Amino acid sequence: PAIGIEISPLSAMISRVKSQFSSTPINGAELIDSLSQFYNMKWEDFYNQHSADSINHQDVLNRPGNAIPEFANIERWFTPEALLGTSIVVEYILCQKGYVKDFLTIALSAKMRSIGNVDVDVVRAEYRKTPRENVNVLKLMKSQIQKMLKGINDTLSYCSNVLLDESSVQVIENNVLATDLPDHSVSHII
């Protein structure tokens, strides 16, 4: 068996998505098609009720189905359009279950710097001096899903002889010093 210990919830989720995929195949074309249909329907519904020239952050935050809470300086972190796209993707993710839900959450997380008004090449997130324009959240998500699935497929084809099945991989979200493991149960630490 393999045990991973991550103190960060996001790191723990990334570890689970990267290590527990073998018994949960994802049909990339179906997933992208389903996300696209949902996204386009919600996008059109929103713009049928709001003028494209005058949408603001509050309109997006008040949108039925939005799960993103208001937070300080939201208008500096997102354009209204990028916030709407992110809101729709989050709504879609919340409709999913299990591995697919975690997979999509990691895909969105990987693209947040490209979606928000931040410079992508800096270690610490800072506002961009000029807001990012024409952010296509759906396109970014589709490319990230394809990239992640390619990585999974490459791993399956090149490393299948060393992969463990999902039930023998455990990711513990905790501090390694506070995790109770049986004596002599660890043979390697990475």
Protein language model features and the residues they cover:
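Conserved phosphoryl-transfer catalytic core
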Residues: 10-89
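SAM-dependent nucleic-acid methyltransferase catalytic core
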Residues: 79-190
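Conserved SAM-binding motif I beta-strand of class I
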Residues: 2-6
